[in-house]
Amino acid sequence: MDNLFRTLFSTFTHLRTSSTILLVGEQHWRNAL
């Protein structure tokens, strides 16, 4: 059970990091344009 929770937590953290990078990248693209 603890292993499953750890996997879910790491996946959620990875998704949050990816979406944050995408948001920052999109803002940089808009500023460049």
From Swiss-Prot:
InterPro entries: YdgV. It comes from the Bacteria. Induction: Expressed at high levels equally in exponential and stationary phase in rich medium (at protein level). This is Protein YdgV. The gene is ydgV.
